[in-house]
Every structure is written in structure tokens, then in C-alpha cells.
Amino acid sequence: SGRPADARTALHIDRCLSCLSCMTTCPSGVNYMHLVDEARAYVEETYERPLFERLLRNVLAYTMPRPGLFRLSLIGAKIASPLAPVARSLGATRIAALLGLVPKRMPVPERIGQPGTYRATGQKKGRVALLMGCVQSVLDPGINAATIRLLTRLGYEVVVSGEEACCGSLTHHMGLEHDALARARRSIDQWTRADVDAVIVTASGCGTTIKDYGHMLRHDAAYAEAAKAISAKAKDVTEFLMMQELPDAQGGLRLAYHSACSMQH
């Protein structure tokens, strides 16, 4: 309708987790994912958030896509975390809540996962790129390291460019389309030059965005085709493993598997 977004609209859109269950259950097949993406961008463009909210979102949007800076921020927040009760008593409940999210122990960076090419073990089956990501590479670097070990053992050469960092998913879900598209283009450039058979993702939320690059950049004449090609190559690591001939399990090990909502819908 052209009407600027208001606080009620912003709150409603902000509360959407993009689990995409609505798309699975909608009998009419409405693409709510794209509707919500457009709504987030519209809210960001037309609604002036309260000062603290603007500051918080700006800090998160600048810090979290940069792994080095995000790690330093976590260290600083960990040092300040004992002050959470003080912040709560002074009425700064949001700051107290953020301090409460700081990990009890800071993850140690893995040696495996640094930029470079990891050779396949045995006969080479193909060449894949691995998105190291921004937040996950700091909070749980062991996931990417384990993925590299597994893929190379299965015969795949793994390329870690280290230059794409954030794929744009984080700022895309904040409605910051200019930043998100710039990060998407940077990632596309890296993976296109790497000439890989697949782009492996270990964070399903990032995978959802990369698989949508073709739509996000459909009006960009310089990137539309390349974006579509990268979207077609994007695979969650679990999807990619389902395509492989895996050896029989040794037995004696029971595992629990959590299927993320963005993988189910």
C-alpha cells in the first residue's frame, strides 16, 4: 500500500524465525520466505527503530559477519558477563540478556579449516568448496574441521577460500539488502573462480540463503547466471553425504540427529 512500516509491523516481522513451516503447510503454495524477506527490507527502509534497537542492530550487523571482530567481541562480553546482575538491577534487561548468552568457555580455533586446499585421501572423486562462515566458525569451529576430514576421507578435494566469510545470510535476515547482496556477490566470485563441483554448507540457515542467490540476484545482469549456478551447487553437508556411497557403520555408536527447521521445509 506504500504505507511506512510501524512498530507493530516491525515487531511482527522481527518475531518470524524463518523456519519456513508455513510454506510446507500452506495448501496454496504461497512463497512466504520471499514475502518475509521483502517485508524485512521494507521495514528497514521505512521504519525508524528506537535508538537502542538501532545501535544494537548496527553493532550486530557489523560485528557478527567478521569472525575476527566477533571473537574479540565475545572475549570482551565474557569479561563483562559477571556484570549481568548489575545491568539487570539497573533496568538494562536487554544488555543483561545478551551477556547471559556468552559461552561459558571460548572455543579454541582449529588448525584444520584455515584458507587453502585440502587434498583428497586416495582416489579423487571431485572438488568442493566449504563455506567456513562467520558466526559458526567462531562458536563451534570443530564442525567445519570435522567436515573437511570427512570429505577428504571420502575422496573430495576441499577448497577453503577464507575470503567470502559471511555469505550474506545474517544481514539478509535483518533486511539489510545492500550489504547482503554485496556479500553474496563476493561469495559467488570466490566459488566461481574455484571451479568446484559443489558448495558445501554446514549451517542450514546459510544454506537457505545461498540456495536463494539465484532469486536474490535475478535482476542483476552481471550476476544473475552465476548466482543461479552457485545456488544449484549449494548443498548442506547432510544432503551431500546422502549422495555418497558411505561405508557400513562399525556399530557400537548411537547418535542423535537434529534436523534443522530450514532443512525440513
Regions found by a protein language model. Name each.
Residues 1-6, 130:
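Signature of N-terminal electron-transfer/Fe-S-associated modules in redox systems
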Residues 8-12, 183-186:
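Well-ordered alpha-helical segments embedded in enzymatic catalytic cores
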Residues 5-6, 12-13, 56:
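Short leucine-rich amphipathic alpha-helices used at interfaces
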Residues 6-7, 257:
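A diffuse structural propensity rather than consistent per-protein peaks
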Residues 1, 10, 15, 19-42, ...:
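Iron-sulfur cluster-binding cysteine motifs and their immediate structural context
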Residues 32-265:
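Iron-sulfur cluster-binding electron-transfer modules in prokaryotic oxidoreductases
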